[in-house]
Swiss-Prot record:
Name of the gene this protein is made from: lpxC
Primary role: Catalyzes the hydrolysis of UDP-3-O-myristoyl-N-acetylglucosamine to form UDP-3-O-myristoylglucosamine and acetate, the committed step in lipid A biosynthesis.
Pathway(s) served: Glycolipid biosynthesis; lipid IV(A) biosynthesis; lipid IV(A) from (3R)-3-hydroxytetradecanoyl-[acyl-carrier-protein] and UDP-N-acetyl-alpha-D-glucosamine: step 2/6
Protein name: UDP-3-O-acyl-N-acetylglucosamine deacetylase
GO MF, any single term: metal ion binding
Source species taxonomy: Bacteria, Pseudomonadati, Pseudomonadota, Alphaproteobacteria, Caulobacterales
Amino acid sequence: MFQHTVKAPALFAGVGVHTGAYTRVAVRPAAADTGIVFVRTDVSGSDNRIAVSPEAVCKTQLGTVVGNAAGVTVSTIEHLMAALVMLGVDNAVVEVDGPEMPIMDGSALPFVRVLDRAGRREQQAPRRYIEILAPVEVIDGDKRAALRPAEAFEVAFEIRFGSQAIGTQAIDLPMDEAAFRDELADCRTFGFLHEVEALRAMGLARGGSMENAVVIDGDRILNPEGLRRPDEFVRHKALDAIGDLFVLGAPVVGRFEGVLAGHGLNNALVRALAARPDAWRVRTFAEDLAEAV
């Protein structure tokens, strides 16, 4: 019913999957109604703060990047954002001393663990959520993403790849903190070997390895340990979508549907929703309780 922040700083460090740069991160407590704010501690002055919002998303190639008017950015935020929203952390200041969040093991599980160690503190402000009132959909060829009214948060996703290592996979899950922990948090990002080589030629994927991603070569999975789940690929895409939705600034009560969607389409959906005030409203759990009495 109430907003929460972290009880103590959540500290972690690692390499960025694209920059290869080693960065240190501290997720610190923040006042009620702050939302999620990234602070680049390696940038001096007042231009180092980035308040997360749909408009702050400035790039979506292979990850979600947020930035401010001064051009200061932080990339690959989606896994941490998914962990924050699903663990009920509404307000936090995320200090990072470089341009990219650490990829850790490629999933959200390391973030869940550090947030668990930090704990959560209840704040004296009602927790808000975004209730979906009418369907909103964006389509790009055979790709689509949609938000529809529902009694609770639900996530459905479908992917189709020519590689037999992936094929067609689909999930449809009611999503709360327990489901996120049990069904999605440990599912890793993935990529094809030939794409990794091309990305590195473009200056990307410099930190990518089988330590932080599932790597596919043709129809083979190269990671010696294999998959954590048979449908790990589609589950990770659902994890990404949850993180991308949280740039709205509050959890969603509604049904998300994604077909072949990526970060770009997810953000297009968020912006389309924001542009449709008839399709959503901000509610608080306190209001719901009062109406139920």
